[in-house]
Every structure is written in C-alpha cells, then in structure tokens.
Amino acid sequence: EYTGPHDRPLRKYPEVAIINGTLGPTGGIVQTPGVSESQKGYTVTSSSSWGNGGTDTRAGWCAFDEGKSTTTYKIWQSGNYYTTTTPGLYNRSPAQSHTADGVNYEGEWIKLELPRKINISAIEINAAAYSSLTGHVGGRPYEGAILGSNDDSTWSLLKSFSGGLSWATTTVAEGGGRVTLTPDTNTTNKYRYIMLVVNKIQGSRSSVDINEIKYYGHEEGSGSLDTTLKSVY
C-alpha cells in the first residue's frame, strides 16, 4: 500500500538558530538597510538596524538567534523612525512600503528568506526586555502585518493586526512579553519569504525592538522523503 507524498510535520523556522552573525559598525549609528546575515540556507534582512557595533550589534539576525549569540542584548532594534507617543507612529521619510493584495503597508520591516517554501500556521513574536532595559518593551509591535512572497517582489497578506496585541507576560530573559498570531488570509499558500512590517509600536520608544521571532509551519511535500510503503496481507 502506497500513500503520499505528504507535507512534513509542523516545525519551527528557522529550524536552527542563526548565531553570531555579521556585526554592525561602531558608533551607535543607524544602518539602512540593516545588517544582513545568511546561515544554513536562511537569510535575514531588515529595513534598518541600530547598535553600537561589536557585541552591541542589534541586527535582524539577532531576532532568530534563540538567545545563543554572544551579543550583549540579543535583539533586533530598528532605526529611530517612530514617535515616542502611545502608540508610536511611523515617521520615516521616505517611508518603507510594501503592497500586498492591493493594500499598502508602511513601516520598518524584518524579512526571513527560507531554503524551501513553507505554509505558515503561526507567528510568535517576543518583546525585547533585557536585564535592566525593560523600557525596550515599548518598542514591540502595535500595528502591522505579516506578508509572504515567493519572488521577494510580489507580496501577499497573511495577517494584519491593529489596535494593539494581547501580550502574555514572560520572563525578562524571554523578552518580557509574547504574542502568537495566526494567519487568516492566503492560509493555504506556501512562501519562501516571510516579512513582518511594523506600522506602529506600543509607545515610549522610537524604534522597533524584538527579542525573537519564530515561524511555525509545514514545508512542501516531497515525494522522495514523505511517502509511506506498507505491506498489505
């Protein structure tokens, strides 16, 4: 009896931590675009990143390191492109902008390129408290969108959110807060590029600050790897 091919089991992506990537320049300056990194088939890019360089790098890849890097803060911090009001409004000029399904989404962004297409089931975002720097929690997303693409050009909406998110309290080491989003648009499609766009932040900060992002989903089925052959009597 032959069955298959099947989609593979639900997994976290990236499947491996992206650790000790490219360090930013010294001097506490904004990098536009942000410091990028490619490891083990994954590439992380962002619209901007900030940090004092060296071990104080706060590049996009830090949001996928599972806290295992030797950098000091282990967070992605964008440039200072938001007002310090509550919520913080996006004010970069010219704005970073992506169109998905006919709707324009503005905001700083962080993008993961995967080695294979996946169907996204859930998105986990962890805020960015660290040690005594609990004020970074104010840089967590308040309004934005999750987008998917297969050519890094044409984008589709997976999930939009506005009016704030319901954050569960976590330990400071975990970022101080966690939210899980479930796609509700284009839910059956598979994508190779996944992007978080942040239009507003919670407030009292001028940057997006994120400890960790985890995508959960299924890879495309593979006839060579995902088939089952059974003897039938």
Predicted regions located by residue number:
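Autoprocessing Asn-cyclization modules and mimics
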Residues: V44-S46
